[in-house]
Amino acid sequence: MAGTKPGDLGGVKVGQYVVIEGVACKVMDTAHSKPGKHGGAKVRLVAVGIFEPVKKEHVGPASSRIDIPLIDKRKGQVLALMGDNVQIMDMETYETLEIPMPDDVEGIESGVEVEYFEAMDRYKITRVISK
């Protein structure tokens, strides 16, 4: 699964995922403001990149559209640790993937089951399921 779908900027909530400047991000803060009698409501989003820890901001009319990344959460088994990468076998399709080793996930070793997700043709390990 890859790509994005359009969504309403005014309906985005904290914890949801959006695409800002081509980067898939998790929304950390939203602010709605109505500037005046004749202006439309504005929405300000503060988000952090999923794959790189970059902070992104987006301001736009509440009625405008924003891209929502299609995220596919899956389970896999760690086959091997290869330096800065982890080789994972998907538990449903049995395909093997090389995913960068995450800094924030503890307990990754050969044979454990992990949860990972794919968004915009990139992969990230989110947590260890079983040891």
UniProtKB/Swiss-Prot annotation:
GO cellular component terms listed in the entry, alphabetical order: cytoplasm
SUPFAM superfamilies, alphabetized: Nucleic acid-binding proteins (SSF50249), Translation proteins SH3-like domain (SSF50104)
Family annotation (Pfam families): IF5A-like_N
Cell compartments where the protein resides: Cytoplasm
Record-annotated disulphide pairs: none
Keywords per UniProt: Cytoplasm, Hypusine, Initiation factor, Protein biosynthesis
GO biological process, one term: positive regulation of translational termination
Membrane-traversing stretches: none
Listed GO MF terms: ribosome binding; RNA binding; translation elongation factor activity; translation initiation factor activity
Residue positions where Hypusine is found in the record: 37
HAMAP family assigned to the protein according to its UniProt record, in alphabetical order: eIF_5A (MF_00085)
Function: Functions by promoting the formation of the first peptide bond.
Family (UniProt): Belongs to the eIF-5A family.
Protein name: Translation initiation factor 5A
The species this protein was found in: Methanococcus maripaludis (strain C7 / ATCC BAA-1331)
Gene for this chain: eIF5A
